[in-house]
């Protein structure tokens, strides 16, 4: 039995979970999420909790067991609390502006980058160097944050670029002058 997969998921009062065919539908205060489930996994709702079991006992079913339990847990957490990732922009002249549904990032190049924010994601700016990405879908929040970060990854010499708030950048020492 999977150590993660065997744990039941408690359903809060404000959340409604439905299992229809191979779909798990989670509805809550913040919104609605849907997850497709493989045939080798069985999901049932009983006594105020979600239980994930596997039908088959092969290698793939064992792998999917823990995966789907984690995905459903993240869905329940997302519709109640939501998820957020924070990014910081470091560098002289590096800044971000929000206009409608787009972010405009000045990252040391001659032109600005325009990043269109997808549906289901909200972005908040704190000043012009802090970005907070929020939403109910953990995958989407992480994907949007990673796409914004990939526009200018932090470099190891001065740390210029876009980094996650909790990210530690390994710094390198620059070239030292040759002594004669």
Curated annotation (Swiss-Prot):
One of its GO terms (cellular component) is cytosolic large ribosomal subunit. GO terms for molecular function: rRNA binding; structural constituent of ribosome. SUPFAM superfamilies: Ribosomal protein L6. Pfam families: Ribosomal_L6 (PF00347). Signal peptide: none annotated. Disulfide bonds: none annotated. Part of the 50S ribosomal subunit. Belongs to the universal ribosomal protein uL6 family. This is Large ribosomal subunit protein uL6. The lineage of its organism: Bacteria, Pseudomonadati, Spirochaetota, Spirochaetia, Spirochaetales.
């Amino acid at each position: 039995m999977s150590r993660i997969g065997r744990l039941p998921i408690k359903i809060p009062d404000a959340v409604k979970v439905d299992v229809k065919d191979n779909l798990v539908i989670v509805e809550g205060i913040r919104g609605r999420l849907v997850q497709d489930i493989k045939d080798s996994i069985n999901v049932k709702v009983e006594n105020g909790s979600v239980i994930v079991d596997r039908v088959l006992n092969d290698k793939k079913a064992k792998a999917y067991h823990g995966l789907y339990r984690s995905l459903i847990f993240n869905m329940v957490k997302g519709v109640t609390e939501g998820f957020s990732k924070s990014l910081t922009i470091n560098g002289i002249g590096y800044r971000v502006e929000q206009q409608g549904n787009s972010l405009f990032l000045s990252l040391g190049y001659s032109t600005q980058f325009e990043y269109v924010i997808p549906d289901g994601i909200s972005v908040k700016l704190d000043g012009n160097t802090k970005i907070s990405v929020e939403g109910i879908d953990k995958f989407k929040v992480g994907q949007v944050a990673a796409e914004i970060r990939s526009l200018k990854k932090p470099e190891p010499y001065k740390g210029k670029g876009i980094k996650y708030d909790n990210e530690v950048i390994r710094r390198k020492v620059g070239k030292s002058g040759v002594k004669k």
